[in-house]
Structures are given as C-alpha cells and as structure tokens.
C-alpha cells in the first residue's frame, strides 16, 4: 500500500473529524461568528452530536471506522460480516441515529436478511464511507467497485447513491494510478456513466470549479441528499485539486452536511496529493488515530 493509498483513507477520516464542530449548521453566519475560520477540530456546536468532543468523528466517520475494522479483520470485504459488525456497533451506540440507520436497523430487527435491509435513503453518506476500502483493494478495481457498492446498499439502497459509490471507486482508483482528479472523474463519467442519472450532478460540480465554494454549495444545497451532496463533493475535488487542506476547510465553512461531501473529497484529494497534503495536527489530534494506524498497518 502506497503513501497515496494511505492518504486516501486518512483524508476521508480527517474530513469527517474536521466537520464535527459545525456539522449540520446551515447558517454560515453562525459558523463565522462562533469559530471564525475552522482550521482544526472543535467540539460540536449542535445537539446532534451530544457527547462528542474535538477530534471525534460524526456518526458517518464512526461507520467508516467500523468498515475499516471489518475489512482489516477479514483481510477483504465480507458483506455479511460487515453487516453484522455494523448492527452490533449500533446496538450500544450513544451517538446520533439518522433516518437511514433507523430504517436499516428496523428492517434487520423485522427479520430481513442482514445484507438486504438497506433503507431507501438518498443521502450521499452511504457512499461516503467507502474510503476504508481503498486500503484493501489497492490493486483490484473491480473488487473495489463491488465492495463500495455493497457497503453502500447495506444502509442506502438507492440506485443513485449506489451508482455514486461506483463512480467514486472508479475515479479514486484512476487517481491512484496517476491520473489527475478532474481527468479521472471526466473519463469515468464518459466511460461508465454517460447515460446515468448521476451524470448531470457530477458535471454540475466539475463545471463549478472556478466559483466561490460557499456560494456554490449554497446554490447546490447544503443538505444530505445526493442531489445536493454529489455536485458539492465534485466541486471540492475540481476546485482544490492541488490543495486538500484548503478544500476541506472551505467545505466545512460552507455549512450543512459537510461530512459526507468532505469524506469523498478528502479521499480523492488524498489519493492524488499524498500524506504531506494532510496537516499533521489533523492526524495527531484525531481521537481514533492510533486505531486507524494499527488497522492500516495490518493490511
């Protein structure tokens, strides 16, 4: 596993931890007033993440860590094993339960097959967990695509969210082979998604690369849905193709569901720029850094 593979994983985790302080704060004026410019980790401002502290993850990052642990223990992605680990984790979870999580758990509790219990949520967050898989399938694109789609469907069984997982799996794989992020995204779009419903959302983001981030994400929508989150994530990848740290800070400053957007952008930008692009403090001050380092070293 190369430095860039490792950075793809760390970039996604750092994006989530950076988002925690202002996650789901939609009024950017409040962000400015309370924090100024968010360049490091903060305790959460909203009540959604009660009990969390600076350096922790949102519930998205927590799930990505469960995925990394499952994949590391299995030496690959085992769909049923991850489903069971995910269910067990939430049995005692003290953090926020979003609607996708609640619906998936309800389906499991109702007796559905663990791997066929996904909600119908169209939130981008289901695809955003996938960075953990980059460390496992660094040399096998088809397995990365398969695993990314399967882990998404576990909780977000929406066609466009699943297709987004495939899109990002193919894109990040190309970036890890040396292709620049925008070129990789454009080729993936042309080769595999030209007639797909997500194509227009990806293109919107790519075409906005020269525009102000806060204004652009406000226009796309700060919400969790793929309609808002996918073009937002693509904007970040295109605009900050040479500057991961600034991109993730600007993502947080744009408000709303900064975590899902940021995790995917952090993955792709990390894959391109490597570990030196991630501020050292973001690693050192991350609560789960030791555990992540241990898991990655075993792959």
Regions found by a protein language model. Name each.
Residues 1-299:
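Structured, active/binding-site neighborhoods that engage oxygen-rich ligands
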